[in-house]
Amino acid sequence: MSMDSVISSRSGADYRSFRQITRDRLLFEMLRSTKKSSKSAWKVLIMDKLTVKIMSFSCKMADVMEEGVSLVEDLYMRRQPLPLMDAIYFIQPTKENIRIFMSDMSGKIPLYKKAYVFFSSPVQRELVAQIKKDSNVRARIGALSEMNLEYFAIDSQGFTTDHDKALEELFSENAEGSLKYNSCLNMMATRIATVFASMREFPRVHYRVARTIDASTLTTLRDLAPTKLAAGVWNCLARFKAMIPEFPQTETCELLIVDRSIDQIAPIIHEWTYDAMCHDLLCMDGNKYVQQVPSKSGSGTENKEVLLEDHDPIWLELRHVHIANASERLHEKMTNFVSKNKAAQLHQARNGGDLSTKELQKMVQALPQYSDQIDKLALHVEIAGKLNSTIKEQQLKDVGQLEQDLVFGDAGTKELINFFRTHLDISRENKLRLLMVYAAINPDKTRSDKGAKLMQLAGLSADDMIAVSNMRCLCGHDSKKSSAGGFTLKFDLRKKRHGIRKERIGEESKWMLSRFYPILEELIEKLSKGELPKDEYHYLNDPSPSFRGIPSASTQTSPAHQPAQSMRSRRTGGTWARPRDSDDGYSSDSVLKHTSSNSRKLGQRLFVFVIGGATRSELCAAHKLSSKLKREIILGSSSLDDPPQFITKLKMLSTDDLTLDDLQI
């Protein structure tokens, strides 16, 4: 059962999830609302470069056409005049966009009969006055409204603000005094606020404070990013509170703002869930995967683009499970399909043995009535096969084992050196990621001669070491002055080896290499229980007496909410291909799947925003914890980065001459 179906129990049948609300606003509040006064049966929808992405992340073209849109146009392209049709403009409220709009609708013969204008974020008064000043344009406007929806709904529980360069603009060596710093944060704040405008939610705003060690330590702009962003979001919310009808006047949810410095490991380490591995190891463009299918002519193969999205039930089931678990489930699905289908059995008997991906694809032609079912099964069998081959070819089990041993303190410098000496055929990219994990745990060791020797031993270039060196930009201050503990990546001086994760009681590894968890998961649980460290996390607004953000006592006392305790590794107990009975919450067989529509109502929503890019492991944690905590958890970020993207961005933090294209790894 999906989160969307489970959360409908929160407040009855009218409850809608984050993505559903976003979609409904675009289709019904914007497109459908124009039908009341428009005499045009079909309309033109005009969008700019940003709003077309906003729309595409939430709606299909068929959805848009169903609301009376026959043509979608680019605001910046030369367009054919359609003076007998009405137009819907969904655009950002910029001077250039408004200039183009007014040019379209002014003069004796405008491009369109009537215009319905919807701005994605608040529009400046002077720009509205400019529109109203032109009597010809004013007479042709059917609606002029602020949609306040300026974010990408990338997932049923995730969004980004489309700030792909946030890491560079906010954390680079040149961020201090840069005009881009304030511009980036201001726009980010506005877009985050539009999430709450869409959801009609008013949050209690928590944020990570600057990590000042003592009065002599200079607080940098990097350290102040969460504080400044929290203030910016609050200012926007204050405006919405006064201007938007039915906007809550008291707190209805919680928002936590952090930055990428809380966890430098999560964007680098190899994740073993199906979704994370697809985006890490396969050459995908966003969610697009290129599948090889039999050509229509019958000879050879051809490429077919497919989207790994929510409409695919197999993807929904597998995306957050371990790759070994996913492979087992796919094998079971194939076996079940064949056992229940006589035609498939005959096809298998003719070919002999198990069905391969190609044989499944041929079966689509032989059994057209099952084409959709077999198509999706063949797709994921092919993907899982590629992933397992890559894992074997790149020796990723060995790489992943050392990564996690370093993180949990079961390995150190000696083991890393030995690995580099004995695994000479490991790829440069994987050696770099190993060294970056080591650097996050032992920052001082990689800045000394030892770091240069490790680089030489691993066969890394000076260009690779830029990424390792630039991790210091996310540390805030000199790690030598850091105190141990907390959520920051400071090594613990009390340990012989510097493990920066604790094993958690009650969450024993179900699969080999599944011990790792992002720090954000721990933070969300602490926030839900009201246990965020007060010296590290402040809030802007005191909660009103009616605020019910903290879950009920019954939730707090459940075994799943016991505090984490340090313990030795149980890594030898994990298994690559055989599950244990423990439930880690990631599986579709978790509590989420078995929650009935009559279950206890969910608590208030919890939003988390990560400045500088979120990871797929963090998005996975949002889904997992929504089930565990009985609250819809929505993860937002400036971008969603896979390891190669993050490493490329890290390299940009200390250079002026290189571009992203120059530094792709």
Curated annotation (Swiss-Prot):
Biased amino acid composition, Polar residues: 552-567, 585-594
Pfam families: Sec1 (PF00995)
Any one GO molecular-function label of the UniProt entry: syntaxin binding
Keyword Metal-binding: no
GO cellular component: plasma membrane; secretory granule
Annotated spans, Disordered: 543-594
Family matches, as InterPro entries: Sec-1-like_dom1, Sec-1-like_dom3a, Sec1-like, Sec1-like_dom2, Sec1-like_sf
UniProt keyword list: Protein transport, Transport
GO BP field: intracellular protein transport; vesicle docking involved in exocytosis; vesicle-mediated transport
Family membership noted in the UniProt record: Belongs to the STXBP/unc-18/SEC1 family.
Job of this protein: Involved in the vesicle trafficking. Binds syntaxins.
UniProt name for this protein: Probable protein transport Sec1a
Native organism: Oryza sativa subsp. japonica (Rice)
Organism classification: Eukaryota, Viridiplantae, Streptophyta, Embryophyta, Tracheophyta
